[in-house]
Amino acid sequence: MSELPQAGAARSGQDERRLVERVLGHWKKVAAGQRFPRLNEIDPWMVGDDWANCVVIAVQSPVELSYFTVVGENLAVALCTRDTLAGLLLSHLPPVLPARRCMIVEGEATLRGVPILYRAALLPLSDDGVAIDHVLGAANHRTLLADEPTMTRVVRKRWI
């Protein structure tokens, strides 16, 4: 997948161009290789302008009852069918919980009737360090060009 545009994304001295990699880097820094971060440790100020492309999902049982507690302004219009970025994030939530790992996912979708390529991250959070009670999500996209071959909604997943 070619690089997605990063209009308005804060670099904060970082060289990483990809939104999901920057947000993953923030999550890893807070986790310090030991545990899942707590919800109150995910500070929008630390994520910078990228926060506009993030969501926080309150995990429920069954997982289909999970819901958004925070939706960044660039994703707000997307609430919440599967052919939107926020809906795509929510649709990828079920395997993240039992795996207890971060997932990066990319693929093709439709956003407001326009074919897009997207990249997203789902990053578990836990107030007690054990039970995943929230998930931080980040997503961005670019429009699929008219002459660009489609991936027929192929989704690639990478577990962290």
Question: Which stretches of residues belong to each language-model region?
Answer:
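Intrinsically disordered, low-complexity terminal regulatory regions
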Residues: 1-79, 87-160
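Short basic alpha-helical hairpin corresponding to helix-turn-helix/winged-helix-like nucleic-acid-binding
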Residues: 83
